[in-house]
Amino acid sequence: MAHEITDEFVASLHASSDSARAVARNAVAHAGVEPVAFDRAKVVATPTVVSHKVDDWKVTSQKKSGRCWLFSSLNLLRSTARTHLGLKDFEFSQNYVLFWDKFERANFFLTDVIATAKTEDLDGRLLQFLLGDVLSDGGQWDMAVSLYLKHGLVPKVAMPETESSGHTAPMNGRLKVVLRRTALELRSLVEAGASEEEIREVKEAALADVWRILVICLGEPPASFEWEWRDDKGEFHRDGVLTPREFYERYVDVDLTQYVCLVDDPRAEHPKGHTLTVDHMGNVVGGRPILYVNTPVEQIREITASILASGRAVWFGADCGQQSDRASGLFVEGLYDFDNLFGVDFSTSKEQRVNTGESAMNHAMLFTGVDIDEEGNARRFRVENSWGEEPGEKGFFTMDAAWFDANVFEVAVHVDDLPAELRAVVTEEPLHLPAWDPMGALA
């Protein structure tokens, strides 16, 4: 059914203008949409203090990069390492794990290209998705765990930030050219019946180019380093020469193999209480598979609050673009009253937003506090972001419970923190979602 826009219809729209609309039009023309829709009463009604606070450290900054998943997971690990080291503001090297993520992900991509060469058309949806998304900065909790378990960690002083680690786009652009060109070459070799050795030679030549680019942009990752430091009390310590794996094993007392991700996939066709995975998502060949336990968001909120009340931080993924304000550091449902500004009903369910591409998890952060009232209800959460100290309360944000339910999609928790019914499904065969599914959006 096709209907043109008629002059009569346009004339009726002109005739429907009123004085209230004129006021809104003038205000938006002068200040923009969000400042006019901003509900200051929500700010006043949202204190930033919480009853249970884990953090007493400074925030970090991912700068102009998409490394939120690495920063937030490292911030979780440093919350324990800092205690062992006696350094309140200790940081692991985010640049070190970025290097290994890019290198491992290049190998993961090329391996995928070879595996799909005979079954997937170049102009098919899967190959076009893989080629379009090659070597993005984003990632998932399980991908971070794969990196840390294989390559260990180093302190920031052992591999500090560079211009390219904080502004990855130019480096990524060069890497994509190498990988996309090699993908075509590898597909041609497979289709022509080339030997495994011939295919490996082309792949390893491309990986050598990737390594060269990464070393120039990020520096060479240390195979070992001498670790010595002065703690916050002024006492000097020397641990001698350590490998990254040894450093990780000595100072990270979190068993990452026992963590599982709970997600709120609101789509009716994906039942709660079952596991999910996203095909072709990962970074380390042979690494930890992506695994989610689909869980009602109310239960995710309760589990998160319980962990925070016990004094432990929680990694999570959310859609940070919804009803949020960077300057005041607020994630508050209804922070912007777009309905009254425009006279339009913008209400949609979480399921509708996911199904239409309106919402997906796009940013990972760390919960570091919760406010629990006298009845035991979690009213708001304290969030450590990785955007530096300028936003919010020196980089920390405040989230209300309604925003949590509407926009938080994922948390990573220890299996011991799960109720028995969720622990029981962790080992079941997951439902496989396609590579382009919204549940893979953070990566």
Predicted regions mapped to residue ranges:
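Short helix/strand-bridging catalytic loops that position acidic/His residues to coordinate divalent metals
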Residues: K53-W57, K350-Q352, E384
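Conserved catalytic-core surface of thiol
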Residues: D373-A443
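Long, positively charged binding patches that form subdomain-scale interaction surfaces
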Residues: G287-N362
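Active-site nucleophile-adjacent alpha helix/oxyanion-hole segment immediately C-terminal to the catalytic cysteine
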Residues: V43-V314, P391-K394, A401
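Short acidic/polar alpha-helix capping motifs at helix-coil junctions
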Residues: H14-A20, A45, D265-E269, G329-E333
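N-terminal regions that are enriched for targeting/export leaders
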Residues: A2-W57
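Catalytic nucleophile-His microenvironment captured as a short glycine-rich beta-strand/loop
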Residues: C68, Y148, N355-G388
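Short His-Asn-centered micro-motif
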Residues: F71, F316-D319, T368
